[in-house]
Amino acid sequence: MNTDEKNQNALIICGFILISAICVSPMILFGKTLVLRDTFFEFRFLYDFSRENIINGIIPLWNPYSNCGQPFIANPQSAFFYPLNWIYALLNFNQAYTLFIFIHLFMAGFFMHAFVRPIVKRNWISFFGGVIFMLNGLLISRIEFLSEFASIVWLPAILALLRVTLLAPSWLNSVLLGLAMAIQFFAGHTQTFYYTAFFGLIFLIFLVFVHFVREKKTAAVLPSMKFLIAAGLLALLIIMVQLAPTYELFSHSLRSQADYDAKTHLASVHPMHALTFLFPYLFGWPGYKSYWGSTYEFWASSFYVGVMPFVFCLLAALLFYRVKKTRSGHRPLEISYFLFFLVWFAIAFIIALGDYSPVFRIFHAVVPGFDKFRWPSSSLVFCMLSMSIMAPLGLKWLLQETSNRALKKNRWVTVTFGALIAVFVTIAVVMN
């Protein structure tokens, strides 16, 4: 790594730190805090109880303060073993809460940057992808639900380490992947962990195809498999301290029953909600009596990414076919990544439709474990992930179009881009 690359990396890290600091600046500078429902009516008391037991050197198997008592460690939402939750034992809740949000926003941006960088091969374009992921409406709305917020943040890190372990197998990469998977599980949102494992398997198959099968190097993938299997076994061994009691608790819960009603209608996203990609407040605002959308509450269908990322995703769809083939006659890998995440975006959105889509019912009936989760809209996280990759590719291809040829030959690109920006910004300002 040369000096210029080191300087760029340092600036990018500083950029993510600055953006994260701006997001929590009212909490740092003015002593304010986000008074959110679940944060203060559930998570605060869970973390206070954890703090009390950590200080006394106790692993709290039982919580005597809730109803007539209930298992504590076995409840994944307690996230007792999540390392970043231990800051609540060192600081008062408001200080720890501020630091928790700051750290996770930074990690969301940096992890996505690390995932996108090998695809776009330009630091500042991958930085754009990181900013999209860390500031999208879905992630910000999940700050209320600290376990889900923390779990989502680890998604791009796991995918990045999965790719690195496959393409550059080593015991170090294998251990890092295993640790990342275990930490995401400890964060406490089982549905996000389940979706990550499900998507990770499909992503792994995609990587094997584009990097090995397509290049006729199928046998070369075999040495990587032992490192991936080792990572999975390491993660399983680590999480058993949480998984074993959670599984026992699950066997006594309503979700273990064959006739369990997941009430998926509460978080089934109506197809008209696709408009909120541009107009986040089209169906109302957060809060009681201020929202009239199809889902239970505003946050359940919140997935606004902003006008610029949306436009760059459209540009990627317009420009990808113009990217030249490589000397081997194949399209560049970035085209394969774009098409993969475009398809996965569509699948994730169809799943999020829940009861409005027959496809969801197929997943619900066929995929093991899928019927035990209540919120179909949680799959929207993969829409955000996909857009955080497609938008940087759209930006890269736009820059290539305007630099490789005479401007007059690319007038249609310039006019289209300018028109899209003008139209969407105008409508967004009026509607929002």
PLM regions: where:
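Hydrophobic, aromatic-rich transmembrane alpha-helices
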Residues: G306-I335, A346, I350, A422
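Start-transfer (signal-anchor) and selected internal transmembrane alpha helices
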Residues: M1-P26, V221-G232, L314, L333-F341, ...
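Transmembrane alpha-helices and membrane-interface helical segments
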Residues: F110-A114, P118, A157-V164, G200-V208, ...
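Transmembrane helical bundles and short interhelical boundary loops of multi-pass, membrane-embedded
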Residues: S403, L407-N432
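Transmembrane signal-anchor helices characteristic of membrane glycosylation enzymes that use polyprenol
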Residues: Q8-E42, A231-E248, I347-I350, V425
